[in-house]
């Protein structure tokens, strides 16, 4: 008598169930990882402007003339995750796209005539996605940011 070889239907269903459970756990974690990577790209876009604004403010005695494309501040740029950017009086505004769609980040420098730039205040705004807002606040965290 020949023996049949192979898996039973129940064994296959158990394996499919295990794969489904692992996928349900793994996919959201991977999506959060991708969002943090996108936020890091947005941060990398901001950092040169931060330095340029600080130098402009020190050289010109304030933030009033620190606009994008003038006084040593580069013209605003876009990247894969940044759809729009502006620099006006030292305030750097970034708008997200793709996995950061709907996110806006506003970085505002603090100025003191005696001490110069005293720090940066971040403002991460997105409607109905508190996880992305928290991730934004974590990534755009400086020792002196509020």
UniProtKB/Swiss-Prot annotation:
Subcellular location(s) of the protein: Fimbrium; Membrane
Membrane-spanning ranges: 7-27
Sorted UniProt keywords: Fimbrium, Membrane, Methylation, Transmembrane, Transmembrane helix
SUPFAM superfamilies noted in UniProt: Pili subunits
Propeptide stretch(es), residue numbers: 1-6
Function: Major component of the type IV pilus (T4P) that plays a role in cell adhesion and motility. Not produced when grown under standard laboratory conditions.
PANTHER family for the chain: GENERAL SECRETION PATHWAY PROTEIN G, PREPILIN PEPTIDASE-DEPENDENT PROTEIN D
Record protein name field: Prepilin peptidase-dependent protein D
Taxonomic path: Bacteria, Pseudomonadati, Pseudomonadota, Gammaproteobacteria, Enterobacterales
């Amino acid at each position: 008598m020949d023996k049949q070889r192979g898996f039973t239907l129940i064994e296959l269903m158990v394996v499919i169930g295990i794969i489904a459970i692992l996928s349900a756990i793994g996919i959201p974690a991977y999506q959060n990882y991708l969002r943090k990577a996108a936020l890091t790209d947005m941060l990398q876009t901001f950092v040169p402007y931060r330095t340029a604004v600080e130098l402009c403010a020190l050289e010109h005695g304030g933030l009033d003339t620190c606009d994008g494309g003038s006084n040593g501040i580069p013209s605003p740029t876009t990247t894969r995750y940044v759809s729009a950017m502006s620099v006006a009086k030292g305030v750097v505004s970034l708008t997200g796209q793709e996995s950061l769609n709907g996110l806006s980040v506003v970085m505002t420098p603090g100025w003191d005539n005696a001490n110069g730039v005293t720090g940066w205040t971040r403002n991460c705004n997105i409607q109905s996605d508190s996880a992305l807002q928290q991730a934004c606040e974590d990534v755009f965290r400086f020792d002196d940011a509020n």
